[in-house]
């Protein structure tokens, strides 16, 4: 944390955690962010990791019917803010940015991080924020694609092998200035563009986004058996 303090004394850093997802690959009664790993929920682990940074505050975009999130023991709970999520992740992020714009400045930095990525390391977080601030440029954590990629046709037959040389797999957090990211998402939605992450919105308005080397253990919990993997990763990191 102290690595950033001298840089962020004048700079405000916020986090947005979209957590209104239905967890479609989990059963309807179970949201992946509220599954337990040891004695805490996935989202509590996630907030704990992000809170290693000198955050001014963080916004959790949660489902309208969600009464559970506010009862959790989040790290630095006095810095927690809640807003309603949206239909898709992108709408949840925009709602959180609209909320933030009432209490933060347009030039403040915001990290957007998946609720179901509890294993991100402090080193990765620190490097990401440091790079963004030093270059004054949006950035994302990502890792180079390691596996051989195949492009297939509708019959599941291989058409060709795709060169992986310049391909990176995007992760979160993704960091940008609040005003720029808000404008990018609003513009993309207005133009009916498919937005899969913050970087895709930023790219669509011509904003430069750099990739910062992440780690393969920054997994996103998507399927029930990912919980056990996340538990093992957290255990080994500690």
From Swiss-Prot:
GO terms for molecular function: 2-C-methyl-D-erythritol 4-phosphate cytidylyltransferase activity. It catalyses: 2-C-methyl-D-erythritol 4-phosphate + CTP + H(+) = 4-CDP-2-C-methyl-D-erythritol + diphosphate. Pathway: Isoprenoid biosynthesis; isopentenyl diphosphate biosynthesis via DXP pathway; isopentenyl diphosphate from 1-deoxy-D-xylulose 5-phosphate: step 2/6. InterPro entries: IspD, IspD/TarI, IspD/TarI_cytidylyltransf_bact, ISPD_synthase_CS, Nucleotide-diphossugar_trans. The record marks 164, 220 as: Positions MEP for the nucleophilic attack. Catalyzes the formation of 4-diphosphocytidyl-2-C-methyl-D-erythritol from CTP and 2-C-methyl-D-erythritol 4-phosphate (MEP). Its EC number is 2.7.7.60. The keyword Transcription does not apply. Belongs to the IspD/TarI cytidylyltransferase family. IspD subfamily. GO terms for biological process: isopentenyl diphosphate biosynthetic process, methylerythritol 4-phosphate pathway. HAMAP family: IspD. The record marks 25, 32 as: Transition state stabilizer. This is 2-C-methyl-D-erythritol 4-phosphate cytidylyltransferase. It comes from the Bacteria. Gene3D superfamilies: Spore Coat Polysaccharide Biosynthesis Protein SpsA, Chain A. CDD domains: CDP-ME_synthetase (cd02516). Keywords: Isoprene biosynthesis, Nucleotidyltransferase, Transferase.
């Amino acid at each position: 944390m102290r690595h950033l303090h001298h840089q962020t004394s004048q700079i405000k850093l916020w986090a947005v955690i979209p957590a209104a997802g239905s967890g479609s690959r989990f059963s309807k009664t179970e949201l992946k962010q509220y599954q337990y790993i040891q004695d805490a929920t996935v989202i509590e682990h996630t907030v704990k990791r992000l809170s290693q940074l000198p955050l001014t505050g963080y916004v959790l975009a949660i489902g309208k019917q969600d009464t559970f999130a506010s009862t959790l023991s989040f790290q630095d709970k006095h810095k927690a803010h809640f807003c309603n999520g949206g239909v898709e992740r992108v709408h949840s992020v925009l709602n959180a940015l609209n909320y933030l714009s009432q209490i933060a400045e347009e030039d403040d930095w915001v990290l957007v991080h998946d609720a179901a990525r509890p294993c991100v390391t402090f080193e990765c977080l620190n490097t990401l924020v440091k790079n963004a601030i030093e270059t004054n440029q949006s950035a994302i954590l990502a890792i180079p694609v390691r596996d051989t990629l195949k492009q297939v046709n509708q019959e599941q037959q291989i058409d060709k092998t795709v060169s992986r040389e310049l391909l990176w797999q995007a992760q979160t957090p993704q960091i940008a200035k609040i005003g720029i990211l808000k404008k990018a998402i609003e513009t993309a939605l207005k133009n009916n563009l498919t937005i899969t992450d913050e970087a895709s919105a930023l790219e669509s308005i011509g904003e430069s986004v750099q990739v910062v080397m992440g780690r393969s253990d920054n997994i996103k919990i998507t399927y029930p058996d990912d919980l056990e993997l996340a538990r093992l990763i957290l255990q080994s990191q500690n």
